[in-house]
Amino acid sequence: MSFLTNFLLGLGLAMDAFAVSMSSGTTVRPFKVSDALKLAVFFGGFQALMPVLGWVGGSAVSGFVSDYAPWIAFGLLAFIGGKMIYEALYGDPDGKVNSLNYSMLFLLAVATSIDALAVGISFAFLGTPILEPVIIIGCVTFVMSFCGAVLGYRIGHFFENEVEILGGLILIGLGVKILAEHMDWI
């Protein structure tokens, strides 16, 4: 695969991570550069790791991934999105949210990188070497996640709770989109 193909694949896979990073950037107060780096490392790392796992697992997990991955992603994103909405409506009146604990980052990273697992499986079926695509996918996701978190922080303080509700709705919407595509509704 060419660099351009791998780069475009990385962009496509990074869109969910970008949206989630942007949502996270709107809610975390006080926001630090280290928060954006945490998001970028988790999302970039998982987007790079999941294709490797898919490639190694190959056809052994293809049935599971195709049957259950959209449901898992939907469940995780709906839960986290619902939690964000709840916290916006009933949480700390100062608007300070620490949604970047490691368990939350892990769940978000898994939810946004399940599609990368399927890409790895397809690479295995096609006999495509994995190293270059994985490096590019991870780097693109790292940069997009970092930028998304910073952008979310920059615009988030203008709207406070409304942006957190919007972020929660975006996560739920991503989950619904993943599920709808799996069910051939769209």
Curated annotation (Swiss-Prot):
Record has Oxidoreductase as a keyword: no
Keywords attached to this entry: Cell membrane, Ion transport, Manganese, Membrane, Transmembrane, Transmembrane helix, Transport
InterPro entries: Mntp/YtaF, Put_MntP
MF terms in GO: manganese ion transmembrane transporter activity
Membrane topology designation: Multi-pass membrane protein
Main location: membrane
Gene Ontology CC terms: plasma membrane
Record localization: Cell membrane
Transmembrane intervals: 1-21, 41-61, 62-82, 105-127, 139-159, 163-183
Protein family according to the UniProt entry: Belongs to the MntP (TC 9.B.29) family.
PANTHER family: MANGANESE EFFLUX PUMP MNTP-RELATED
Function: Probably functions as a manganese efflux pump.
Protein name: Putative manganese efflux pump MntP
Taxonomic source organism: Methanosarcina mazei (strain ATCC BAA-159 / DSM 3647 / Goe1 / Go1 / JCM 11833 / OCM 88)
UniProt gene name: mntP
